[in-house]
């Protein structure tokens, strides 16, 4: 079976969804920009040699509809002979795109693929057109479709206090801002055109959504966002609303060596699981355990983790049950996470994987794990190994 390697991984800056940098930039353009950039950064691979493009996107309507993967590829002037498909596993879409491409390469059906994902929540809100079947309520609580309430449930079940959530959220912003100031994101962010507050066209090379002024004291003043009477989850301890895209060049190890391209990491194992929709945020726990089992590893073998921060109330129970509470500052989301950077749904799986690869290199660790929860009760995880 072929070894699957990541040759390159990049992303756009994360733009604010409400009146932000990409308010006049379409999702297809963000995607096409990264496709062109990956090919330009790796000229040894001819675009015509790509076997497929897998692109995650959740709200596949309006500008994100009608197979945005193909639309973006055509905009990027990828040869017409290269196919493209849009992948949807809700929050895990672009990580699923990676898994789909990896399996194709493992079986010998492909040698080189572009994978990634995009979400422009500013143009296509996450709830746009959603119409749940009324019959679902026979088997699943209605609140299971309300992500904030599932986070509230996890917080109560695991004893996660408001103070713990506020502290974790403040940490996310502080870590993300420190990473920005130290140029830790420089290797992953591709400068991307947008508009500043005055409408002037400019190149953005930083994440617009980070709030460096965030403090625990300021977060403590916010009202609960989802359960006004008894809740502990606020807007400040939830993932920010942002627009962005991320992309990776995935190849068989043999093809990368043939072309003289240096692999950055191997895909060591992959896992996806289902869980109770009412506690959808717990999905990373069984997904990570399964991925570790497939890799023949334990959590203690992993040097750094990227865990998508849907909510502080959601990620803290996952950290706790993976036995990592004492290692948060050494291993977990060292450059902040979605609370600070935002969670553009179809982009996030590739985004956290891209950040993870850079952290693995900077910290000089052998193994890294990226994982995320998925709405309606799923979890997805990938173990990477440095080459």
From Swiss-Prot:
The annotated active site, in chain numbering, is 91, 343, 373
Subcellular location per UniProt equals:
Cytoplasm
Q: According to its UniProt record, in which pathway does this protein act?
A: Lipid metabolism; fatty acid beta-oxidation
> Which leading EC class covers this enzyme?
transferase
Catalytic activity, reaction form = an acyl-CoA + acetyl-CoA = a 3-oxoacyl-CoA + CoA
GO BP annotation list = fatty acid beta-oxidation; phenylacetate catabolic process
Which EC number(s) does the record attach to this protein? 2.3.1.16
Q: Does the keyword Metal-binding apply?
A: no
Keyword entries, A-Z: Acyltransferase, Cytoplasm, Fatty acid metabolism, Lipid degradation, Lipid metabolism, Transferase
Classification via InterPro entries: FadA, Thiolase, Thiolase-like, Thiolase-like_sf_Thiolase, Thiolase_acyl_enz_int_AS, Thiolase_AS, Thiolase_C, Thiolase_CS
The family database entries (PROSITE patterns) matched by this protein are listed as: THIOLASE_1, THIOLASE_2, THIOLASE_3
The source's superkingdom equals: Bacteria
Q: Which GO terms describe its cellular component?
A: cytoplasm
Membrane spanning residue stretches = none
GO molecular function terms listed in the Swiss-Prot or TrEMBL record: acetyl-CoA C-acyltransferase activity
Q: Which family does it belong to?
A: Belongs to the thiolase-like superfamily. Thiolase family.
Describe the function of this protein. Answer: Catalyzes the final step of fatty acid oxidation in which acetyl-CoA is released and the CoA ester of a fatty acid two carbons shorter is formed. Involved in the aerobic and anaerobic degradation of long-chain fatty acids.
Subunit info here reads:
Heterotetramer of two alpha chains (FadB) and two beta chains (FadA).
What is the protein name given in its UniProt record?
A: 3-ketoacyl-CoA thiolase
Q: Which organism is the protein's source? A: Shigella flexneri
Gene name of the record? fadA
């Amino acid at each position: 079976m072929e070894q699957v390697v990541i040759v390159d991984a990049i992303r756009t800056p994360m733009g604010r969804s409400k009146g932000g940098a990409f308010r006049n930039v379409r999702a297809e353009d963000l995607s096409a920009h990264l496709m062109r950039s990956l090919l330009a950064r790796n000229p040894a691979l001819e675009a015509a040699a790509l076997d497929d493009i897998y692109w995650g996107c959740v709200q596949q309507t309006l500008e994100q509809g009608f197979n945005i993967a193909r639309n973006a590829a055509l905009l990027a002037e990828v040869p017409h002979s290269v196919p493209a498909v849009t992948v949807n596993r809700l929050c895990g879409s672009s990580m699923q795109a990676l898994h789909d491409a990896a399996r194709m390469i493992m079986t010998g059906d492909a040698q080189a693929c572009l994978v990634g994902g995009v979400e422009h929540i500013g143009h296509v809100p996450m709830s746009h057109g959603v119409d749940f079947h009324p019959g679902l309520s026979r088997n699943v609580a209605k609140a299971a479709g309300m992500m904030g309430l599932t986070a509230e449930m996890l917080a109560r079940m695991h004893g996660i206090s408001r103070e713990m959530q506020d502290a974790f959220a403040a940490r996310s912003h502080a870590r993300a801002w420190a990473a920005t100031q130290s140029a830790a994101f420089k290797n992953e962010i591709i400068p991307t055109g947008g508009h500043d507050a005055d409408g002037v066209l400019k190149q953005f090379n930083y994440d617009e959504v980070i709030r460096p002024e965030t403090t625990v004291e300021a977060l403590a003043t916010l009202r609960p966002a989802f359960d006004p009477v008894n809740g502990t989850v606020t807007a400040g301890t939830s993932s920010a609303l942002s627009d962005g895209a991320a992309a990776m060049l995935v190849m068989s190890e043999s093809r990368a060596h043939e072309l003289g391209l240096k692999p950055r990491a191997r895909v060591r194992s992959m896992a996806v699981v289902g869980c109770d929709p009412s506690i959808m945020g717990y999905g990373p726990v069984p997904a990570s355990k399964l991925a570790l089992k497939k890799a023949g590893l334990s959590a203690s073998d992993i040097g750094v983790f990227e865990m998508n921060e849907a909510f502080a109330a959601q990620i803290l129970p996952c950290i706790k049950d993976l036995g990592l509470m004492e290692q948060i500052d050494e291993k977990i989301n060292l450059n902040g996470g979605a609370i600070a950077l935002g969670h553009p749904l179809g982009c996030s799986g590739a985004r956290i994987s891209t950040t993870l690869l850079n952290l693995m290199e900077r910290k000089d660790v052998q193994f890294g794990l990226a994982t995320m929860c998925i709405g309606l009760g799923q979890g997805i995880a990938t173990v990477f190994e440095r080459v």
